[in-house]
Amino acid sequence: MINSFELQHGRLKQVQIESKAVLERTQPIWIDFDDPTDEERLWAKELFNLILPDEDDFGDIEASARCFEDATGALQIRSDFLLDTADGSRNVPVAFVLKRDILFSLHEEDLPVFRLLRMRARHQPGYLEDCWDLLLDLYATDAEYSADALEGVYANLEEIGNRTLRAYLSDEDAAEVLASIADNLDDLYFLGQ
């Protein structure tokens, strides 16, 4: 799926992309590829001379592979963004490309940070001025989202601590406490990455 956004009076305006022709007519500041199809990848190549990285390229942990200028002069950045769900927390890899004053983003899952930024930028005039503002605000929003998730984990651990300090703890209660601690440690592990 492709979400394209134009900047109008300092606000993001979403343009529904249903065909290559519609994408070609837009004047985007941001094009967000959410689990793109092969056809959508081809549109990126044909319209923007942009070869979208494969998911295999996302996981490279070498510092030189996380941020670099490619052969076309585009800035390529690889990052992880937090996805905090009821089932637990995990990182989702995201690739960014800054080219021709457009931010291209590529990820395989919908991320709350992206939704939150889109909502803010639609409703607050002057919120963004260019693709650089957009990229920086995505990182700032991710830091805010991660901090909220971390606060939730610590609140859970505090509640677990209060339960364990009761005078009597049955074996069943102790098992629940240990399971809760393990779940929260998993969340802390993902938040720390």
Q: Predicted segment positions?
A:
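Helix-boundary and N-terminal cytosolic regulatory elements
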Residues: 1-126, 154-156
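Extended amphipathic alpha-helical scaffolding segments in membrane-proximal extra-membrane regions
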Residues: 80-193
